[in-house]
UniProtKB/Swiss-Prot annotation:
This is Large ribosomal subunit protein uL24. Keywords: Ribonucleoprotein, Ribosomal protein, RNA-binding, rRNA-binding. GO terms for molecular function: rRNA binding; structural constituent of ribosome. It comes from Blochmanniella floridana. Part of the 50S ribosomal subunit. It holds the Pfam family ribosomal_L24. InterPro entries: Rib_uL2_dom2 (IPR014722), Ribosomal_uL24 (IPR003256), Ribosomal_uL24_KOW (IPR041988), Translation_prot_SH3-like_sf (IPR008991).
């Protein structure tokens, strides 16, 4: 299995949709569905019923929804734009690099 190009806590930029161009940090990554949750991006309103057992009030809450991996790209802070991810073998370990300038992704 190949390594993931986007991982948790990476800074990504949204390529399509209502939040196009916005930058955020990956909070959750679902590999089986190939989707991510990015903090502050793709915020939707959810109508929630009250749950008296858990002392949870009902109402309209805002939460981040999933975005498909194809709609986000890793953000290169050195160039201040979206970039692609490449891999190199260094000291027997596979590391991620930015394709445009070859810098290591932290």
């Amino acid at each position: 299995m190949s390594a993931n190009k986007i991982r948790c806590h990476d800074e990504v930029v949204v390529l399509t949709g209502k939040d196009k161009g916005k930058i955020g940090r990956v909070k959750f990554l679902c590999l089986s569905k190939k989707t991510v949750i990015v903090s502050g991006i793709n915020v939707v309103k959810k109508h929630q019923k009250p749950v008296p057992n858990k002392n949870q009030p009902g109402g309209i809450i805002e939460k981040e929804a999933f975005i498909h991996l194809s709609n986000v790209a890793i953000f290169n802070a050195a160039l201040n734009k979206a970039d692609r991810v490449g891999f190199k073998i260094k000291n027997g370990k596979k590391i991620r690099i930015f394709k445009s300038n070859g810098n290591l992704i932290k």
